Amino acid sequence: MLEAAGAVLLGSAALLMVGRLGNRGFFLWLRTVGILGLLVGILSLALAALTGSAIAGLVVGVITAAMMYLFSSRIVRIQMGAVDAEEFLRYKPEYADKLRRVQEMVSKLASKAGLPEPELVVVPEETGVGGYPNAFATGRRSKPTVGVTEGLLRHLDDDEIYGVLGHELAHVKNRDTLVMTVAAAVSTAIAYAFDPWLNAMYTEDWEDIAFLVLAGMLASLISTLLVAAISRSREYLADEEGAKLSGNPMALAEALEKIEAIVKSNPAPARSLSEVSTAHLWIENPFRGGLLRLFSTHPPVEKRVERLRRLARELQGP
């Protein structure tokens, strides 16, 4: 099994290197497959080296993936404090016209993308992060949910919102919820495979347990960084496909610049690990500073804008 794990790691590293040769759809897909392969390779090594917790790690990973994928919409809504559009309008009716237009945009983009009608939810400013302009998509491809913040309704114009919604529906079309759920579940399985308390059930050697603590910390760090790298690749892909879907790359670029300027001037405080864990779902990470930079789930806005400007020139033609 060690040889097989080594082969998976080498093959995945090769795919990752090839994927880094470009920043367009096919190369981004190769990059994602390569990073997922590295995660699976690390897990395979853990399962090969550790007999006791291997089964536990695998079972926990599978259960976590299934539960997170099946109930992702409900889980994310609770984490973000999102409410139905109708409920939001009951106590903030001044947004009725804007939300009606947003719902029409969502319906139009979903139809163009060949997706079923998504559920629209709103994150009120009272949640803290809801005061910043932002958006997210979650749920299965057959039953998607698109969320916008109150800050997005207040700060962005219709063209910019349309560009943002195109990005979010591209995530749904690309099954990014499934990709990120699998990546996070494998990362969880790695952590459990190296868990010192589980392994203590199978050994009384404290030197082995100490090694597992260090190995587990390193494996968890590497897997977390790899999950963040997958998220960054998927953001590039959603930018490209979302801009093509909306037909206006510059509107998305301007929206990203506006969101970045507002977040930079007054970053959202990360009040809990639960909030930080949702960072990869937003179109732009609202949290800033500290160690969060090391685990960035989004590419730099300036790079995203540069790519969108290039795409706009290509779509305009000679």
UniProtKB/Swiss-Prot annotation:
GO terms for biological process: proteolysis. The chain crosses the membrane at residues 1-21, 35-55, 56-76, 178-198, 209-229. Binds 1 zinc ion per subunit. This is Protease HtpX homolog. It is a multi-pass membrane protein. Its cofactor is Zn(2+). The keyword Membrane applies. GO terms for molecular function: metalloendopeptidase activity; zinc ion binding.
